Regions:
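C-type cytochrome heme-c attachment and multiheme electron-transfer modules
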Residues: 1-153
Length: 153
């Protein structure tokens, strides 16, 4: 339906695990560990900041890598010196592809659905500048459609 405007995964992927705030360190006994501040199940549709002939889409699926400033300080203080210089929400191709999904069962499951699209409110304060190119502003959301039927398969 959307051809080169929307990546196939936006309509055909199911939710994937999103991790936030990964920390690496050692416990009191010196045993290495990592932990995340939180995890959620879902995904967001965001803008494609760098279209290519192979990925010409305006919109694609984004996932949140768990890295934050300080993640690797256990190994080397300030190991991520350039955090915030590129988007932290990355394009992904989840292994949850299905022909029929919640979002492709009706047009308005995506059109006009703010929750499905990456919003500035989804970002941590230190991610806002880096993700400006992938956030979908309100005026970029696909409008709710008067008809809500998909063409027959």
């Amino acid at each position: 339906i959307h051809r080169r405007k929307v990546a196939c995964q936006a309509c055909h992927a199911q939710a994937v695990k999103q991790c936030y705030g990964c920390h690496v360190g050692t416990d009191a006994k010196g045993i290495a560990y990592f932990k995340c501040q939180k995890t959620t199940l879902g995904f967001k549709i965001g803008r494609n900041p760098s279209p290519t002939p192979d990925r010409p889409y305006t919109y694609d699926v984004k996932r949140h890598p768990p890295v934050i400033p300080g993640t690797f300080d256990f190994y080397s203080p300030a190991a991520i010196k350039q955090f915030g210089q590129s988007p932290t929400w990355k394009a992904c191709a989840p292994h949850t592809i299905q022909r029929h999904t919640t979002q492709n069962s009706a047009c308005n499951n995506c059109h006009g659905n703010r929750d499905l699209f990456l919003d500035i409110s989804d970002l941590a304060d230190d991610e806002v500048a880096a993700n400006a190119a992938v956030v979908v502003a309100d005026d970029q959301l696909p409008s709710t459609l008067a008809h809500d039927a998909l063409p027959p398969n």
